[in-house]
Amino acid sequence: MPHTLRVAVTQAEPEWLDLAGTVEKTCNLIGEAAENGARLIAFPECWVPGYPGWIWARPVDVELNTKYIYNSLSLGSPEFETIQAAAKRHSIAVVMGFSGRAPSDSLYIAQAIISPDGEVLMHRRKVKPTHAERTVFGDGSGADLSNVVDVDFGGEIGTVKVGALACWEHTQPLLKYHTLSLGAAVHVAMWPPLDPHGGVEHPGLWSMSAEGCQSLSQTYAIESGAYVLHCTAVCTEKGREAMRTHDGLLFHTPGGGHSCVLGPDGRRLTQALHGGDPAKEGVVYADLDLSKVVANRAFLDNVGHYSRPDLLWLGVDRREKGHVVDGERRL
């Protein structure tokens, strides 16, 4: 029987628009989680250098967009290697969301899974940015469907399949079904800071609220039969001032932190931090009994015994689509 896997789910505030500062905080949280016995730590969507909340306050902000590009994180950069080194030093897997900067200076909502040995096991981009996010971020491609990897924790735990999706990717049935087919036992659902819904007359969508997004994560836990690490960020007055979101649809009040761990049947396993104060930082810890994933899938396996592939099936194109094609070869 598999042993338990101790996980850490951050509920923290980034150093807004500060690449070096957020990388330093990332490494500190990695060390803290390892000291508390965690073997895997999860970070939210666009953790580095923070989610660009101003996109929900005004249609364009050239100054902040430019600063955001300069402070976004590139795969293979010294900053990324610093995070890899922290994972290796503390022997902990890191599942992290970040604003990924391409060599052309385009940005993508990116995710990475780093092994306890410091190896990048998975790097992907959000397949389709949501609404106003498209003013900052580009689309992913076929290779970004590969979002579940084997993470070797060694010892009694051994290898565990770990996966991730970003934010409203949890609304997309086809993308979710493909991810289900990859068989993760632990899934990280990455979200930005989330506000409670303002009521029936509020112009914002309930499906974008703290309640709505947790509902999406819980639904994914039920559908997949996996543990879901529902990871959100915090935005205090410091973030509001940095992004000037006081009058925005989102990020207009301090808060955003609603991190928790969900069981493979959808139940919430952890209590809210700090009595439910969403403006306070912390780390949620949980010990995952991986045998419960197997037990749950005996009842519900949507890509196995509880499916009808003779009637319904999913077509997938995992090829990376290059921007320049030289004959049959994409550059």
UniProtKB/Swiss-Prot annotation:
EC number: 3.5.5.1, 3.5.5.5
Cleaved signal peptide residues: none
Pfam family, one: CN_hydrolase
Keywords for the protein's UniProt record, in alphabetical order: Hydrolase
Catalytic activity: a nitrile + 2 H2O = a carboxylate + NH4(+); 4-chlorophenylacetonitrile + 2 H2O = 4-chlorophenylacetate + NH4(+)
Protein family membership: Belongs to the carbon-nitrogen hydrolase superfamily. Nitrilase family.
Function field: Nitrilase that hydrolyzes preferentially phenylacetonitrile and (R,S)-mandelonitrile. Also acts on dinitriles like phenylenediacetonitriles (PDAs) 1,2-PDA, 1,3-PDA, and 1,4-PDA, and cyanophenyl acetonitriles (CPAs) 2-CPA and 4-CPA.
Protein name: Arylacetonitrilase
Native species: Auricularia subglabra (strain TFB-10046 / SS5) (White-rot fungus)
Gene that this polypeptide is encoded by: nit
